């Protein structure tokens, strides 16, 4: 096999590869041998028919097509290690070809075959000055209100209840049966038995809860309410309703007092007083907020990078398909733990409801792939503009992490040009994104 030409175009880098007659015959003979294994002919045992005789008695066009497929797969692996490819590697954004086709496949008698393989390139376009990337200001400092709300939640988690032989009050939890009617007809979803309801929680519509104040265990009452005009059930919007309610139990809720004894009961390390507890909460909330803010900045930056790609930029469909296939495989692994045929996957996930189709899934993942590629293109441009590169230490760190997680030797990763290059690209993308995020974060906080 040899590369006979390299064409560097706007969107693609294309390589023409010739297979020698000897190499092509290796692929073809292998397919002929497969096809002749079960060939029965007088004078020969099955699988022992000479190739030249077998060729006249098997479906040669099928063997030819299968040989082309095998040759194409082998070339896709082979080309990545060639010097001509490596020279162009930094311009190529995906090492899976967007097109891979034989040039002279119309004649099964051909003694040699050539292929053209095209790879998607990083497009060139202008990106904003980093200082001009603007995102909305984000609250990044924990305040007193946040701490107070966290304390209220913790106190509520430790509430206790006790049954009371008295009339219900706001903040009591009552256990009730209820059945609802609209125009004297019971409606779906309007009935429950032994339901726990905190009076004043506003979890029921209108003033339903307030109308139960004053009732005791054993009392019955018709509660009249009106459904909101924007209620989520269409046939109940704005309707007047009557609920037949029976009260079984009235529970008084006792909220613990925030004092040193309560704090000690939480068994927090080195936290024994209210003051220490508030400091502890503030620190924990700040950690959570830092994570939330970081995610918000990342999301906003992702959107901004996406917008920078010119709207008229054409992304090769083959490139989109390659990324979409990866996304679909990842989705399969995350949901069912393995990669299966896409039709089988859709059937498993949809369960026969018809909400998800193969076409819909592919289109959704292709849209995600386009968004992903746009960001990848923008990051590549910023790596040039800001002169950001990855050091050997950056790559070594990534390799060590991958080797540890995949039980693969570091040496094997380094010796595989495709894998090594992919790691290098991911490390660069990560470094550029972190740089941009840090710059944007200064203005956002």
From Swiss-Prot:
Domain PPIase FKBP-type: 171-256
A GO BP annotation: cell division
Entry GO terms, CC: cytoplasm
Recorded GO MF terms: peptidyl-prolyl cis-trans isomerase activity
EC number(s) recorded for this UniProt protein: 5.2.1.8
The reaction(s) this protein catalyses: [protein]-peptidylproline (omega=180) = [protein]-peptidylproline (omega=0)
Keywords tagged on the record: Cell cycle, Cell division, Chaperone, Cytoplasm, Isomerase, Rotamase
Broad enzyme group: isomerase
Main location: cytoplasm
Membrane-spanning intervals of the chain: none
InterPro entries named in the record: PPIase_dom_sf, PPIase_FKBP_dom, Trig_fac, Trigger_fac_C, Trigger_fac_C_sf, Trigger_fac_ribosome-bd_bac, Trigger_fac_ribosome-bd_sf, Trigger_fact/SurA_dom_sf
Localization, UniProt: Cytoplasm
HAMAP family recorded: Trigger_factor_Tig
Family the UniProt entry places it in: Belongs to the FKBP-type PPIase family. Tig subfamily.
Comment, domains: Consists of 3 domains; the N-terminus binds the ribosome, the middle domain has PPIase activity, while the C-terminus has intrinsic chaperone activity on its own.
Function: Involved in protein export. Acts as a chaperone by maintaining the newly synthesized protein in an open conformation. Functions as a peptidyl-prolyl cis-trans isomerase.
Protein name (database record): Trigger factor
Origin organism lineage: Bacteria, Bacillati, Mycoplasmatota, Mycoplasmoidales, Mycoplasmoidaceae
